[in-house]
Amino acid sequence: MAVGKNKRLTKGKKGTKKKIIDPFTKKDWYDVKAPSMFAVRNIGKTLVTRTQGKKLASDGLKGRVFEVSLADLQNDEQSFRKFRLISEDIQGKNVLTNFHGMTMTTDKLRALVKKWQTLIEANVDVKTTDGYLLRLFCIGFTKRQPNQIKKTSYAKSSQCRSIRKKMVDVMTREVSQIDLKETVNKLIPDSIGKDIEKKCQSIYPLHDVFVRKVKVLKKPKFDIGRLMDLHGESAGGKGATDTFEPPVQESV
């Protein structure tokens, strides 16, 4: 074959190199705001592609889930829970979030499980007064008596059933009579777990009783007024001023 007739040898040599564009030039940073139940409101920043034509930046942000440690939300290094917050609305450069779930850290959960004691778990689906359907998971362990000689502290199966029933009753009673905001306020110090521990003392003494996990199964129809109340008037005010800032800058 004659040299110079091979088309593949010359392919790709024509024209200049493709210009590399940094993808971050098309993106904007937004502040993520936690609801007013938490001590720290500004939990971080998130990145999204800027609005282009019909593709809005707010659509790309809505529905994002942020997992934040309670230690960061409450400035408490002893906390061992992680809260999931979901983005529900955008106000200017602020992303307003709502409660989307809770879990315990894996290291804490593994540290609780020990020999010579009975592990008791229960879960229940409860609907709050404002229409949120939550699934709560509870965990507890039997405790040795102060003057006990026996090495083990195992509960009978009948006692486990009674404790499990008591766990379900307490969780249902505590959550079904309040809204989501008050539920989160109870989950932060875990007052539900402490209440279960007190109620079960007559059946079998327990320790390390926690609501280890909360899932949001169903939500009511989105209401901007309710979300603003959840973030407090100050958050709503800040969002309103941020919304009007960009047009002023453009006119100047």
Curated annotation (Swiss-Prot):
GO biological process, one term: translation
A Pfam family: Ribosomal_S3Ae
A GO MF term: structural constituent of ribosome
The keyword Ribonucleoprotein belongs to this UniProt entry's keyword annotation: yes
Keyword terms: Cytoplasm, Ribonucleoprotein, Ribosomal protein
Stretches assigned to coiled coil: none
Localization: Cytoplasm
Family stated for the protein in its record: Belongs to the eukaryotic ribosomal protein eS1 family.
Subunit structure: Component of the small ribosomal subunit. Mature ribosomes consist of a small (40S) and a large (60S) subunit. The 40S subunit contains about 33 different proteins and 1 molecule of RNA (18S). The 60S subunit contains about 49 different proteins and 3 molecules of RNA (28S, 5.8S and 5S).
Protein name: Small ribosomal subunit protein eS1
